């Protein structure tokens, strides 16, 4: 049981740990409680990372002290970004992502934004602020 617990819940691949390090180095905070991580194709290529190395990155960055909203912008291919959003009880993640054609649940949602990484970052931040400010 102990080895299975460790293998499934307490270990991460070296690629995953390196990716977490790269992501942490680039974290940005907006409005004092929105933490945003960006994962580019260049980052993925540099580590030869795969889809499974990216699992639950949004929850990982939500661990930042004071962060009520965690946004991950991941470039899937040139011109296409996947957004993962995790929120506290004061912001409906599904309502935010619905503004951008996505959906999900109150505390976890996602969408796809077509355009540059910079555009995706600006659009999701604008949507968070729109829903938050009512």
Language model features with spans:
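Hydrophobic helix-and-loop "lid/oligomerization" segment in the mid-to-C-terminal part
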Residues: 1-99, 104-134
């Amino acid at each position: 049981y102990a080895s299975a617990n460790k293998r499934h819940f307490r270990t991460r691949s070296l690629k995953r740990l390196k990716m977490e390090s790269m992501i942490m180095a680039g974290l940005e905070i907006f409005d004092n409680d929105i933490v945003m991580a960006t994962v580019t194709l260049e980052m993925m290529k540099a580590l030869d990372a795969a889809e499974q190395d990216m699992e639950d990155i949004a929850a990982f960055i939500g661990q930042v002290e004071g962060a009520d909203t965690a946004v991950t912008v991941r470039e899937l291919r040139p011109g296409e970004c996947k957004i993962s959003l995790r929120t506290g009880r004061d912001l409906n993640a599904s309502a935010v992502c619905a503004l951008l054609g996505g959906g999900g649940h109150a505390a976890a949602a996602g969408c796809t934004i077509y355009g540059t990484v910079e555009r995706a970052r600006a659009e999701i931040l604008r949507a968070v602020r729109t829903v938050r400010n009512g």
